Amino acid sequence: MTTITITRPDDWHIHLRDGAQLKDTVRDISRYMGRAIVMPNLVPPAIDTETALTYYDRIKAQVPAGSQFEPLMVLYLTDKTSPDEIRRAKASGKIVAAKLYPAGATTNSDSGVTDLKNIYPALEAMQEVGMLFLVHGEVTDSSIDIFDRERVFIENILSKIVADFPELKIVLEHITTKDAVDFVTQASDNVAATITAHHLLYNRNHMLAGGIRPHFYCLPILKRNTHQQALLAAAASGSKKFFLGTDSAPHAKDKKEAACGCAGSYTAHAAIELYAEAFESVNALDKLEAFASFNGPDFYNLPRNADTITLVKKPWNVPATYPLGDTNVVPIRAGEAIDWQVE
């Protein structure tokens, strides 16, 4: 039986939601992740230090006994985020980054940034105090094809931010294109990217060919196979610039299986197992530990986790649904087998 032991991984991009759903999302992600960067796009969003810290307390209250799971908090940038707010957030010791959501780009992004120039004072403060800048890299112009929005964002917006703030550490989150891989690879050491398990395992054919499969619908949207292969190559390359970020984003079953379904795929139930499948598919299991457990903390200047987990190649069947507060979520690979499990 094949087994691999790796340093305990972290998730550098997750949506835990709030309220009644929190106990279920925290239960799933805390099983073997040491830490997670928690997205701030709540309703209302975590736009200030106080809101982010009270959210931290709600998450910690749901961490199961015996788990050392630690949430790492993020400030939601708006047109009005002040340099003083950035300094307050950094001083808290619990808020490690601030997030750019272009207004309207994704779930609960309506409070996001309408013009990049509006956050330049905040970015200057972040560069000064060493707070990371997390980016949802898509333009929101309705005239731009949804499959091109990441590429256009990189060309028109991100390249300028990188040039204007050379000392700012930037994470281009949940990259989905060869364009993003190439940009991050060629950029300075201050630019990195997270990659999801579902973008490594699937492409738009899985979502659209032979019937619409709404549980694969996420933002940024799944791209063509050539982009998927570029992501796999980047993740398995050994480059320190790429690391694990699930972007696990639960929605109730009826919100996904609808005439206008929500964007987001749920993978927290089996995150590292799905990544193991992806790395095995390109004969790169030896590169999984660095991607999952080393590159993220190194980029964030945080210590690596001290303990380990063991994965065993032993197929198991994923339930059709998992509880999500007072409703249910359909996970990726629902009703099907996953090849790996945590021992």
UniProtKB/Swiss-Prot annotation:
Catalytic residues in the record: D247
Entry-annotated residues carrying N6-carboxylysine: K99
Catalytic reaction(s) noted: (S)-dihydroorotate + H2O = N-carbamoyl-L-aspartate + H(+)
Entry keyword set: Hydrolase, Metal-binding, Pyrimidine biosynthesis, Zinc
GO CC list: cytosol
Annotated metabolic or biological route of this protein: Pyrimidine metabolism; UMP biosynthesis via de novo pathway; (S)-dihydroorotate from bicarbonate: step 3/3
GO biological process: 'de novo' pyrimidine nucleobase biosynthetic process; 'de novo' UMP biosynthetic process
EC number: 3.5.2.3
Domain of life: Bacteria
UniProt xrefs under NCBIfam families: pyrC_dimer (TIGR00856)
Entries under PROSITE patterns matching the protein: DIHYDROOROTASE_1, DIHYDROOROTASE_2
Protein purpose: Catalyzes the reversible cyclization of carbamoyl aspartate to dihydroorotate.
Name of the protein: Dihydroorotase
Quaternary structure and partners: Homodimer.
GO molecular function: dihydroorotase activity; zinc ion binding
The UniProt record lists the keyword Acetylation: no
Stated family: Belongs to the metallo-dependent hydrolases superfamily. DHOase family. Class II DHOase subfamily.
Binding site residues for Zn(2+) 1: H13, H15, K99, D247
Entry binding sites for Zn(2+) 2: K99, H136, H174
Binding site residues for substrate: H15, L16, R17, N41, H136, L219, H251, A263
Cofactor annotation comment: Binds 2 Zn(2+) ions per subunit.
SUPFAM superfamilies: Metallo-dependent hydrolases
Obligatory cofactor(s): Zn(2+)
Species this chain originates from: Shewanella baltica (strain OS195)
